[in-house]
């Protein structure tokens, strides 16, 4: 999606100008995950035909932009986008309007929101619309509703997700796996508050350079902020007592809930929210430890993505360099950048460069992952930071008794756990690996006469911490099998009189695979192994065939 966004934004700007020529009053343009949007101030609705008449009617050679606003014929249209710039080299000619809706920013105003895409060639547009049709079939928002995983409610607030029991089960499994990864690298888990005085953000630089994302409020004369990042809090834990060179590296991890004020037009299911949980980690170490630490992080990151079934060709690291707005000296930035380059080269991974896309406090390695629909998602990040230790005056006592500054490394492998859930749901089309599935086995008794045996099978699995449930014979067997398949259940156990008398089950798995006369204890043994190893494939049924 990222590669399309510059041409989409240019298309949105062109269409906004043309709408002005038609007498409409657009107030903002921006980008969503899969399209552009234009907000038009209007007391009445705008039809698709009216929008189509404005497309390509007038294309200015030079778009008049001042202070991130389109300025045209006395109108000012805000550009709600800070990562993608307007390119003079792009010339979108082929548009598709995807949706027109209305919303009310306040009780007295109505905006019409136009969503669409634009491309330079007709072939690009056709290819994208074909892809979009496939993607909509696996939209995580539809899967989430169908499987009863999560929901959003206007009463709760835009971009604030509520995870239901089955959705929370998936999150818990992801967190448990990452805890094991963290333990293998020597992390100590911490917990920090959701709210801090803004003094901490002023020291870190977030207050100035991240101000539009901060949620702040005043209480008893002090200004507080809901945390957008966990790093300053971890820094304070480091500062809570003296440290020596023998203590380093110190590795803190936290599944920390953070909040960022994303623009309403940018919100998109779990992929773009205002509150989410990061699998965050911060390492405090000596300079001589830096290269090996980064190499270990790169290796572990690749190991994690392999566990989810992504191949080497699906994993692409990028070095993101110093942005225009940043803190720290040229010398510190060069030192941090060289450390990342050295570790990447020694890892043997081919990597790309993303100019000026580093964090404001340091360069970083970003990992992009390709899903089953061919989309690339930016997930993992490793950031080297010499600047925040300087700002917070962090110290350790070196072996010669001299106080020195530690280096800080920020890292997250999933990135946002909530966003990763969305990506997995779409990647696996709702059919998650058994270890991640909220319901791993569903038992189907053929008749009520075998309910007692079915319940014994159910309880034996639950005793072994397998997430199992039973669907009694209220509907036909074929209907119940279809329901289980539609709800993404990996294994179905069918039990009748024969199975009850022999202590067996009939096992059905994805792909219409059926294995009869399976000893229940054998199935249970294989399933426990599959779940314990976190296999992506259904290895239990493969072993039974």
From Swiss-Prot:
This is Threonine--tRNA ligase catalytic subunit. The gene is thrS-cat. Keywords: Aminoacyl-tRNA synthetase, ATP-binding, Cytoplasm, Ligase, Metal-binding, Nucleotide-binding, Protein biosynthesis, RNA-binding, tRNA-binding, Zinc. Its EC number is 6.1.1.3. Zn(2+) binds at residues 231, 282, 410. It comes from Saccharolobus islandicus (strain M.14.25 / Kamchatka #1) (Sulfolobus islandicus). Its main location: cytoplasm. GO terms for biological process: threonyl-tRNA aminoacylation. GO terms for molecular function: ATP binding; metal ion binding; threonine-tRNA ligase activity; tRNA binding.
């Amino acid at each position: 999606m990222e590669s399309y966004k510059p041409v989409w934004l240019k298309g949105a700007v062109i269409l906004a100008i043309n709408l002005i020529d038609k007498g409409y009053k657009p107030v903002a343009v921006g980008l969503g995950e899969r399209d552009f949007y234009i907000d038009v101030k209007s007391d009445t609705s705008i039809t698709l035909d009216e929008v189509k008449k404005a497309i390509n009617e007038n294309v200015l050679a030079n778009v008049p932009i001042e202070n991130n606003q389109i300025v045209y014929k006395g109108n000012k249209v805000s550009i709600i986008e800070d990562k993608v710039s307007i390119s003079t080299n792009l010339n979108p000619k082929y548009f598709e309007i995807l949706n027109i809706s209305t919303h009310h920013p306040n009780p007295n105003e109505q905006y019409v929101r136009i969503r669409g895409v634009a491309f330079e060639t007709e072939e690009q547009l056709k290819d994208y619309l074909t892809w979009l049709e496939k993607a909509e079939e696996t939209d995580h928002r539809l899967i989430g509703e169908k499987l009863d995983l999560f929901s959003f409610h206007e009463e709760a607030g835009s971009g604030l997700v509520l995870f239901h029991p089955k959705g929370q089960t998936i999150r818990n499994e992801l967190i448990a796996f990452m805890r094991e990864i963290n333990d293998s690298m020597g992390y100590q888990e911490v917990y920090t508050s959701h709210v801090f005085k803004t003094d901490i953000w002023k020291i870190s630089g977030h207050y100035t350079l991240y101000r539009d994302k901060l949620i702040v409020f005043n209480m008893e004369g002090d200004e507080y902020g809901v945390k957008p990042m966990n790093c300053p809090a971890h820094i304070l834990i480091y500062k809570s007592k003296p440290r020596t060179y023998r203590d380093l590296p110190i590795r803190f991890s936290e599944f920390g809930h953070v909040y960022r004020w994303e623009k309403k037009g940018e919100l998109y299911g779990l992929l773009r929210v205002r509150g989410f949980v990061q699998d965050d980690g911060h390492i405090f170490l000596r300079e001589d430890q830096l290269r090996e630490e980064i190499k270990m992080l790169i290796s572990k990151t690749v190991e994690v993505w392999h566990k989810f079934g992504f191949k080497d060709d699906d994993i692409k690291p990028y070095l993101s360099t110093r942005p225009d707005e940043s803190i720290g000296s040229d010398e510190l930035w060069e030192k941090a950048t060289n450390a990342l380059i050295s570790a990447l080269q020694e890892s043997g991974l081919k990597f790309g460069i993303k100019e000026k896309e580093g964090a404001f406090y340091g360069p970083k390695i970003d990992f992009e992952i390709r899903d089953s629909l061919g989309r690339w998602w930016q997930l993992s990040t490793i950031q080297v930071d010499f600047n925040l230790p300087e700002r917070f005056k962090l110290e350790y006592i070196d072996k010669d008794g001299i106080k020195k500054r530690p280096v800080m490394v920020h890292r997250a492998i999933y990135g946002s756990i909530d966003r990763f859930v969305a990506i997995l749901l779409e990647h696996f089309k709702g059919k998650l690996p058994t270890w991640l599935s909220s319901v791993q086995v569903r038992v189907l008794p053929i008749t009520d006469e075998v309910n007692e045996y079915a319940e014994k099978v159910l309880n034996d699995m639950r005793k072994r911490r397998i997430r199992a449930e039973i669907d009694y014979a209220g509907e036909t067997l074929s209907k119940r099998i279809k329901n289980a398949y539609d709800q993404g259940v990996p294994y179905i156990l069918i039990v009748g009189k024969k199975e009850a008398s022999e202590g067996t089950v009939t096992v059905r798995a994805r792909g219409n695979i059926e294995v009869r006369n399976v000893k229940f204890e054998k199935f249970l043994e294989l399933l426990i192994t599959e779940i314990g190893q976190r296999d992506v494939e259904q290895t239990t049924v493969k072993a039974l065939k």
